[in-house]
Amino acid sequence: MSTELVTTQKLLVKLPKNVDKPQEQLDLQYEQSLAALVALKDEQTLPAEIRQHADRLTKWLNRESDSMENMDTSTRLTQIAMVQPTTQHAAKPDNAKPGDLFSTVGDLISRPFKFRVLYGFRTHVRFQQGEKAPVCGSPDGVLGSPLGKCDLCAFAPMGTQKIPGTTTPKPWNDQKPSECANQLTFLVVDSTYSNLYEIQFSKTSIKAGNVLATLAKGSGDKLWNKEFMLETEKQANAKGTYYILKVSPAGNPIDDGHDKVCLALKSFDVAGRQKFLRVFYDSY
């Protein structure tokens, strides 16, 4: 198959940047990034504490697998979730109350949760009213399955809608609420370099995700040189009370010598995501 275009009966789709490589090259890139991450625990140019952090985080990624070869970040990363009054998540701790944070492996997360950003990406997901499963989803905010190109979709998320027949964004006042929602996902490491998580911002918390994206960009390529705090805030409307995520800076930029660890973690996860996107586009 061409590395430039994916042809389906529905449409012609251009592969995204950095995914337009042969699958073999993406596989090799993934294997090399994994090897570089694993090797950090033995890199003598790094202080012992940082080598220990690298080893601990690598094991955290691999905590459910007996072999590093079986690591799959797309299914293995733990998410941080928020308790709403109606939350029925199977991993919610018994002692968790509305407004609390918990991990999808069942741990209660202390608030505020202090973290550093490794990288982030945007996705789209569409739910029809009353349905628990999405009717369409896009892992990159560009191509959705099964409805096709996001920028041509009648259900494009508010803020991304285009003037019909063009690629020109509609004026903000003409943007309408949609069943499809923007989601911002960030790969983060906690401030003690003990755990890796994904934090997803959507719906009423998308504003906090946009704030985090803007603040993190101020660090340039080294997003991890800034620390942030994740909190929740109680809100109310005609339907009752609910909670939203809030993000704020935790202090001045910090360079604590973890550049190699953070870059290796980012590179490994990005390589895994690129592999996943290539498979997604090829199977469309």
Where are these regions (language model features)?
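OB-fold ssDNA-binding interfaces and closely related basic DNA-contact patches used
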Residues: 2-192, 237
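Generic surface-pattern signal
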Residues: 20, 39-42, 62, 66, ...
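Intrinsic-disorder-associated interaction segments
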Residues: 23-27, 43-46, 50, 201, ...
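Intrinsically disordered, low-complexity N-terminal regions enriched in serine/proline/glycine
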Residues: 29, 118, 192, 196, ...
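Exposed alpha-helical structural elements
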Residues: 56, 205-214, 257-263, 275
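Long, highly charged low-complexity segments enriched in Glu/Asp and Lys/Arg with interspersed Ser/Thr
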Residues: 124, 154, 237-284
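Extended serine/threonine-enriched, polar tracts that run as long, contiguous segments within proteins
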Residues: 177-252
